[in-house]
Amino acid sequence: MKYSDLRDFLRALEARGELKRIQTPVSPILEMTEICDRTLRRSGPALLFEKPIGFDMPVLGNLFGTPQRVAFGMGAEDVSELREIGRLLALLKEPEPPKGLKDAWDKLPLFKKVLSMAPKVLKDAPCQEVILEGEDVDLGRLPVQHCWPGDAAPLITWGLTITRGPNKERQNLGIYRQQVLGRNKVIMRWLSHRGGALDYREWCQKHPDRPYPVAVALGADPATILGAVTPVPDTLSEYAFAGLLRGQRTELVKAVGSDLQVPASAEIVLEGHIHPGEMADEGPYGDHTGYYNEVDRFPVFTIERITRRRDAIYHSTYTGRPPDEPAVLGVALNEVFVPILQKQFPEIVDFYLPPEGCSYRMAVVTIRKQYPGHAKRVMLGVWSFLRQFMYTKFVIVTDDDIDARDWNDVIWAITTRMDPKRDTVLIDNTPIDYLDFASPVSGLGSKMGLDATHKWPGETSREWGRAIRQDPAVKQRVDELWPLLGLD
């Protein structure tokens, strides 16, 4: 099923029993976080707080609190269908020459569809039904969550940040958290390798004395939101990818105060500029690691204009010790990553990012091993192939007889197929998430690879053990006897 805007999605979720309206007054200060956290841990519904204490704007939380709802948002009926999206992205990332005329003819509709998904620009849009400027710009009127007791200030969490570099035609979409500093200022926390930060750096190099235009959309349609967190090829815009997910072109409208184009159906849009040299200390905030992060300096975004729907909904989330909403997103997007990795490394059977590993800090890979040193090649490939894995600290590689998603299997492989000295790969001075306070230097640390595969000649001089397996005939015989044994 496809959704034209956030409200269309909410209606569909409500019809499925996947949305709960909360009419009891609830505070966005701490209380919503606790309610959403308990609900997510029970795989509960999305929550629409209709009476947030102190505000007249409803708050939407836990929207992507189950992998199934992420799949719904991407236009799929089941999480397993997300692998098809991964196969599409793998093909678009590295298209293969057609094997013949028939193959070229078969692929033609796909590429025609991609080319037809350029965004559609409207003259008028729901996101600009109300326009607030000057002294009317006041973030204090938005029910921005204050998530944890030690947080520095309320935090905008689901802001879809729209930027464009000075040398680029297409825009970048990214989700970056934003600490509220005052009536019209937030801190734009984007890590240095993210698209928004790269666009801003290029702008500062080319126009060091000019303010940088930025727009932030809150409450976009699910395909556009999820397109911003999916590994889209650099040649494909997130807006075009969202159109592919939705099955229709993404509708945009020109921002009131800049040339940026924003989602026409968004609930709220913040428009403004980052002024040269204006920085501020961000944090501390409770983060997806389960800890409060260190204070660090980031650019300040000055909001000059708020446009919104007349009856806008504020979309929010929280981050904390897994599972949280980013961890759930990671579980679902894991299925998208698998075909992309397999396109580059066909020997990969499965790839798993355990949610307990904060979505990306640990990966388990199963392979069809073909030669000595193969596991090490795969480790290095995972770290370097997609920028989503540049912060992955631990990569475990094992054989395809192991279930990557079953810790009992993985731990057995590690403890029986590894020699700690021979089979551990350590790499120093690599990029690390600055939120990782375990690293010796902010943003720079080490990585560990664990080779838990069977060892081939050249990797060991010893006879390798043979795994114990029962005789299949005996297993079948016991299957027949089992109902008679009274053991169930």
From Swiss-Prot:
Listed pathway(s): Cofactor biosynthesis; ubiquinone biosynthesis
Keywords, alphabetical: Cell membrane, Decarboxylase, Flavoprotein, FMN, Lyase, Manganese, Membrane, Metal-binding, Ubiquinone biosynthesis
SUPFAM superfamilies with a match to the protein in the record: FMN-binding split barrel, UbiD C-terminal domain-like
Catalyzed reaction equations: a 4-hydroxy-3-(all-trans-polyprenyl)benzoate + H(+) = a 2-(all-trans-polyprenyl)phenol + CO2
Cofactor needs: prenylated FMN; Mn(2+)
NCBIfam families according to UniProt: PRK10922.1, UbiD family decarboxylase
Family: Belongs to the UbiD family.
Protein name as annotated: 3-octaprenyl-4-hydroxybenzoate carboxy-lyase
Species per Swiss-Prot/TrEMBL record: Azotobacter vinelandii (strain DJ / ATCC BAA-1303)
